[in-house]
């Protein structure tokens, strides 16, 4: 939908509810950028069948993240925190979502 194309969401998400919500918003045309820890990754990577034959790229993870962009960022590191704050400013984030 063109109605939502100018809305940017930065999402720090895991589990089921928020990833599903941001999936729906991405399908409605919003730009969704999800943050993922560079070492631990998203636990959803391990759910479902391994349909591609690639490590940590299982079916549920692929489906629930369709239409989203992704960045890896270590928020425990001061440099990661600095990048996080600059992302919010420079991307003109309309919504920050976390669970």
Where are these regions (language model features)?
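N-terminal helix-loop segment corresponding to the beta1-alpha1 unit
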Residues: 1-99
């Amino acid at each position: 939908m063109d109605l939502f194309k100018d809305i940017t969401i930065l999402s720090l998400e895991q589990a089921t509810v928020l990833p599903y919500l941001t999936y729906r918003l991405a399908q409605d045309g919003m730009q969704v950028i999800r943050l993922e820890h560079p070492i631990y990754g998203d636990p959803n990577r391990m759910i479902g069948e391994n349909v591609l034959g690639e490590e940590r790229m299982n079916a549920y993870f692929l489906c629930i993240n369709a239409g989203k962009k992704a960045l890896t960022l270590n928020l425990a590191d001061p440099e990661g925190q600095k990048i996080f704050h600059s992302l919010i400013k420079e991307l003109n984030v309309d919504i920050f979502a976390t669970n």
